[in-house]
Amino acid sequence: MAALPGAVPRMMRPGPGQNYPRTGFPLEVSTPLGQGRVNQLGGVFINGRPLPNHIRHKIVEMAHHGIRPCVISRQLRVSHGCVSKILCRYQETGSIRPGAIGGSKPRQVATPDVEKKIEEYKRENPGMFSWEIRDRLLKDGHCDRSTVPSVSSISRVLRIKFGKKEDDEEGDKKEEDGEKKAKHSIDGILGDKGNRLDEGSDVESEPDLPLKRKQRRSRTTFTAEQLEELEKAFERTHYPDIYTREELAQRTKLTEARVQVWFSNRRARWRKQAGANQLAAFNHLLPGGFPPTGMPTLPPYQLPDSTYPTTTISQDGGSTVHRPQPLPPSTMHQGGLAAAAAAADTSSAYGARHSFSSYSDSFMNPGAPSNHMNPVSNGLSPQVMSILSNPSAVPPQPQADFSISPLHGGLDSASSISASCSQRADSIKPGDSLPTSQSYCPPTYSTTGYSVDPVAGYQYSQYGQTAVDYLAKNVSLSTQRRMKLGEHSAVLGLLPVETGQAY
């Protein structure tokens, strides 16, 4: 193998202190420069290319001398998966040849001589399965492993010659899976040495080395009664002591080791379910409503060109929770706001059912100063504009659930407008009585301070003469508006219940 620049190629070279017999196999692989890759053990390999045959021989030879696959992997610097696959294939088939990469295996068709033997075996023993006929062909030397027909081919021959399929094919496959390992034992494979010459292989013959194979235990199948007993014990404790495990083993007729393994697997499944439940509970805390009381939310979002202060929620316990400032809707949301104006009757009915005040459908005075770039005056519903245009028609309330403080700097806090959940539904004067020089910033986008009290009421502070100028300069679009749009819309009664969300 062309070594990596500046390094001596040492791929798969066993260490000097090993006690297994050594052979003359060269353990250095030559590859074209630039194609070699180094695995986690320091060995060089080419991705997608089979391991060389002399290294495959060495793996089988070391396994024959009792060296564990993990040690073989470290000594030869071959990945553990590669070693295990080569040994498993050798134990099952007696061959160290690599399998086909991609595509399907060529279909093995029985020759006329082999078909005659199949018919002869079937007449001698009518209850013989297809896989047994296949093994008999190998044992008697009529075929080798490269020319022996497949089980499906033998079944096809039997179906054609005898007019019916030899038993159920699915039963044949299950029997084949269950008995193939026993029939294809290492002794049986190695007993057929003469038929193991591989013409297409780089080596003259397959290695003649029997390997010790530890049989794998079959999976334990629990009955409903056993599972019921185990689940009851798991409800009492997740870590039973030795006495509890032995008692369970006697009641369920299982071994104590099986009970211990069941509890280990059950604890792993319980931890997985607990993690999924915690994730589902966390998803409910995402934006879309008020968070639980006393739970801090995201830190204040710093806007580059905005002078809005941070909104705070003051609670009775004295703890202050900082919330990001709500912002105007985006262009997509403005279309939804216009649609909300068309659903004014539904919104008014919603407010009446929930004891909100019903507002008139009048907009602000058309002579009032407006800005075509201002999304507030262009996209708000009539209810919001009617509240802002005629504050005197709404009587004040001394105790409010959410009190919205006025903007800082030049705003009149003496006069205030308030909307109470308990006040009657009465019409508000049209907006033409408002002087043209006076306008108010909607409380939806104002700097708000919420005080949570048990009384259900909403009090809105009136803004002064400079609110329009302040609004024209400072209202901007931001993604934070989407986070708080739901709760502010619910306060203003913009969300019809029957027709779904207006945004």
From Swiss-Prot:
Q: Which InterPro entries match?
A: HD, Homeobox_CS, Homeodomain-like_sf, OAR_dom, PAIRED_DNA-bd_dom, Paired_dom, Pax7_C, PAX_fam
Q: Which SMART domains match?
A: HOX, PAX
Organism encoding this protein:
Mus musculus
Query: What is the gene name?
Result: Pax7
Q: Which family does it belong to?
A: Belongs to the paired homeobox family.
Q: Where is this region: RED subdomain?
A: 113-161
Q: Provide the protein name.
A: Paired box protein Pax-7
Picking any one GO biological process from the record gives:
neuron fate commitment
Name the residue ranges with Basic and acidic residues bias: 165-186
Transmembrane segments annotated in the record for this chain: none
Annotated DNA-binding ranges come to 34-161, 215-274
